[in-house]
Amino acid sequence: MQQSKEQRVHGVFEKIYKNYDQMNSVISFKQHKKWRDKTMKLMNVQKGAKALDVCCGTADWTIALADAVGDKGEVKGLDFSKNMLSVGETKVKSGGYNQIELLHGNAMELPFEDNTFDYVTIGFGLRNVPDYLTVLKEMTRVVKPGGMVVCLETSQPEMIGFKQGYYVYFKYIMPLFGKLFAKSYQEYSWLQESAKAFPGMKELAALFEEAGLSDVSYHPFTGGVAATHIGKKL
């Protein structure tokens, strides 16, 4: 019986959670942290704000948001992998982040009221959901008018030569890194599949607009291997 995308992705992250943070650094050559830092500068998160990190995984971006909003702010992190959340909980407790609450839930049906958050983020998670537009619409629903929806994700490089090298890396080399460092060749093969199938920057910007967001902009990183998309709710 063929697994659904949701079932397959859930199985992947339930298995690789222990090595996820290390592997992110290995396969991105530690660039993912720089991409997130640049994204946070673009967001200019305000003290005391309320933020939601969708598909929060091990809570790295959740914690960055908590640092930005400060003690008087509030941050929720949501993920469907309990094992990934367990790693995040350890980080949150050790860091003393009382303003963070991590929740087990589904990005396709966010368990929050309309117009709740000032910022709603998703980092390297949108490519793994069953339906991109449904999740973007949910993120738009729960953000306040004037609030910001932000996606940091792998993208499709457009530079000739660079594009081909990117696909070779994702298809052949990254799964080998998964096998060497995390004993998970099959799981990291899935990650390259999801990255290859993900929309390019212009296509994702169009989905942001279709979800009801305005002033949509995108910002490529490292030759377009990743990009941040930002949209505002009117």
Swiss-Prot record:
GO terms for biological process: menaquinone biosynthetic process; methylation. InterPro entries: MenG_heptapren, SAM-dependent_MTases_sf, UbiE/COQ5_MeTrFase, UbiE/COQ5_MeTrFase_CS. It catalyses: a 2-demethylmenaquinol + S-adenosyl-L-methionine = a menaquinol + S-adenosyl-L-homocysteine + H(+). It is an enzyme of class 2 (transferase). The keyword Cell inner membrane does not apply. Pathway: Quinol/quinone metabolism; menaquinone biosynthesis; menaquinol from 1,4-dihydroxy-2-naphthoate: step 2/2. It comes from the Bacteria. Its EC number is 2.1.1.163. S-adenosyl-L-methionine binds at T58, D79, N106, A107. One of its GO terms (molecular function) is demethylmenaquinone methyltransferase activity. PANTHER family: 2-METHOXY-6-POLYPRENYL-1,4-BENZOQUINOL METHYLASE, MITOCHONDRIAL, METHYLTRANSFERASE. This is Demethylmenaquinone methyltransferase. It comes from Bacillus pumilus (strain SAFR-032). The gene is menG.
